[in-house]
Amino acid sequence: MSSPEPSPVQPAGRARCQGAWQDAARARTEWTWRAGRLWQIVACLSRPENVTRSLVDSVARSPRGAYLPRMGEPSVPAVGTVERWAWDYVRCEHLEGKLRPAPLPEDWEPEIAPVRRLLAPGRPPELRVVAKAVKTRGLAAPSGRARALHTFFHHELQAAELMAWALLAFPGAPREFRRGLARIAQDEVRHMHLYAGHIARLGFSIGQFPVRDWFWERVPRCVDAASFVATMGLGVESANLEHSASFAARFREAGDEEGARIQEQIGSEEIGHVRFAVTWFQALRSNLDFESWRLALPAPLSPALMRGKPLQREARLRAGQSEAFLDELEAWQPDSPGS
């Protein structure tokens, strides 16, 4: 026996059904958008080491334009793009690849690209990563100077990787900003060569001393591009203006003029990196004052870790930091030890 034919839905009824379906779809979209945003915030603020690799935050755009999470690895960028160059550099596990990355491509992915927040870099087997670094003591012996330079080499490596990381993590940032990150990454690689060359002249090689991924333990907590430049350019690289001047004097005192010259050269080039951060923090947040910068640092970082002594005021002023900013930075005291 044949089933009775269903009665056709009248146009008015069809319209009501479609309207109800559309309302339900909008509600689902709104719910997933909010859930995705909450997930992003939690993932960004969590300690990276506590986020399992199965929850690597690859994301996709919702119809509303928000980024929503997908389980599994982030999507791999297309070959021949700047994004793929950055991806390959961060994930590279060969020392030669870290020291000599491929030439930077000219092509970019389309404007709407997924967020790719890589949780950790590839590490060459030569580098022995430890949980706690050994502090550099005296520089009189070549081994002491080589150890210090090895630490600085690894700082530059992490800086290069994190510039590439930010290029992938913040695809919604202006193209010119992301292009600048790639250029700075190339500068950091050049600095690595300066350090590696002098380490070799002292009779040592990359990998003879342990390293710590201190920057990687902290910087990926940055929630947006402004937070990133606050941490790296206005924080870490600004502090290096003091550290490079201090170590240049110490190397010269130890009779190592070449080591002192390298410190001075890198310190001078850091001014441009800090200026880049000043420019973009102002562009992204409309204003750069001490308090807005301090609040942009991801916990537990604070201004105490982003300055050396004595403050290199002239270099910082050349980089675009104001007298008022420097006065507050110099005077700032943490609420508790270790902040």
Predicted regions and their residues:
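Leucine-biased recognition of intrinsically disordered, low-complexity hydrophobic segments
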Residues: L38, L45, L55-V56, L68
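Non-heme di-metal
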Residues: R64-S339
